[in-house]
Amino acid sequence: PVNVYHADFKIKINNAVEKASSIVLCAVQKNLHAARKVLSGIIGNVPKNNKPKTIIFDLRFLSAIKQKVFLGSEKTLFVKHTAMMREACKELPQSVEYVPLACEAHSHRSVALAKTVAAPIMATGVGSALMYATSSGPYYAQSLSGSPDIEMIKNRMAQLFTQLDASVRNKYRPAFDKWNELVDKLNHERNTVPFACLTTILSTAINETPEGDTNVAVVMGCKSAKDRTISIVLGNSMLQTLFEKRLADGREIEKLFDQQGYFNCDSLTAKELMMLKDLFDIRVLHLSNKFNVGLQGNINTDVLQDSFFKNVDF
């Protein structure tokens, strides 16, 4: 529970330019001692520069869907974790602001399957209990984050973005605009992967620029920081490279979204398609799921394949 993982991404924009960004991964923390240890790991991964302030954007991939087998949604986990992290931040000698945000992270297609097919067939065993746990609606629940939390992260990102140099703002304006569109729609798992990716891209741009007084640490995790998180990090690695290259070339990222907000393959060039094929590896998800629950695929794998990328023939 107190492990902190550091995911590094190196993105080759062209032969002359390579970008690097990082994400800190950690599980939900349920006590102050664990939160202190996790926070120490997060701060240790903040860029080493002269900016005196740090802001932590903590994206929690949890589910607001009401569950039958367990005691409800994962709201209690979210409330406890964020309370412990806020308390731990207050104890630090330096200025660290903690801004959490919940992102829906259960596939609604799998929920529908659990209601109709899987639960009756898998009548016994832990697998059926876990699958059926998410089968009580509503499918599209209200986000675990309230309106004040959403407004806070919007305001903070806007403040950080306006501190950027004008040329950097112009380059990343499409990413910022799309981020602002998605931040209000995180009660649907379709938006979780692209939102996480855009948060990483904008935070990297903020950290790279000498303007401003604040570093941004992007933290991601579900309950355990394993299967759901790995699913989203893999989606991030695919999208971040694609988005960054399009932003560098002045090409649209909006065309990568269809009218319903899902990933659109139609605008991909042959080179982009090959790049995505190289970046996607289903074995990463299978290994994660097998390690976590003993199965090569489960409902959490579908966060990637049945949500934003549901129209992609993997």
What are these regions (language model features)?
Residues 1-221, 231-314:
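Cys-dependent protein tyrosine phosphatase-like superfamily
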